[in-house]
């Protein structure tokens, strides 16, 4: 009779990857995710961005986080976050918090419109009122696939 190992090995986090139109900027998102945010602030509305969030670099849980590489320019119209664009094709790739608590990684979001549609089609949309109330709005059952034209 052999002993059975009952310790579960950690399930790897799903990986979602995206890139800008010209391919110069690439991001990798490694964390469980169920929602993508559609924000109605003046910038997100104009670009049609849909966001998923985690920490830049290694996340809080092992095997999670966001990595982004490429030649990007920063646009920071407000006080708390910077938007990251490809310098060549100007796709909006991500935003990054300007500050983090001491010793903590920076909070970041990547634009799922730069991912393969099949990788993100199932994500539910969380509407965020970034224009007036700065609050999440009730879920309405729509998913990212409902936003592809």
Can you say where each PLM-predicted feature lies in the sequence?
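A short Gly-Trp-Pro
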Residues: 2-19, 24-149
């Amino acid at each position: 009779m052999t002993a059975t190992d009952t310790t579960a090995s950690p399930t790897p986090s799903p990986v979602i990857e995206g890139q800008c139109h010209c391919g110069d900027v690439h991001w990798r998102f490694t964390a469980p995710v169920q929602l993508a945010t559609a924000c109605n602030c003046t910038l997100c509305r104009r670009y049609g961005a849909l966001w998923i969030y985690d920490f830049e670099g290694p996340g809080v849980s092992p095997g999670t986080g966001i990595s982004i590489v490429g030649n990007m320019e920063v646009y920071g119209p407000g006080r708390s976050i910077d938007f990251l664009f490809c310098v060549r094709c100007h796709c909006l790739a991500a935003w990054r918090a300007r500050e983090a608590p001491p010793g903590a990684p920076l909070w970041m979001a990547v634009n799922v419109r730069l991912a393969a549609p099949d990788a993100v089609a199932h994500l539910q949309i969380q509407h965020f009122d970034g224009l007036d109330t700065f609050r999440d709005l009730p879920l309405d059952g729509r998913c990212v696939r409902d936003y592809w034209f």
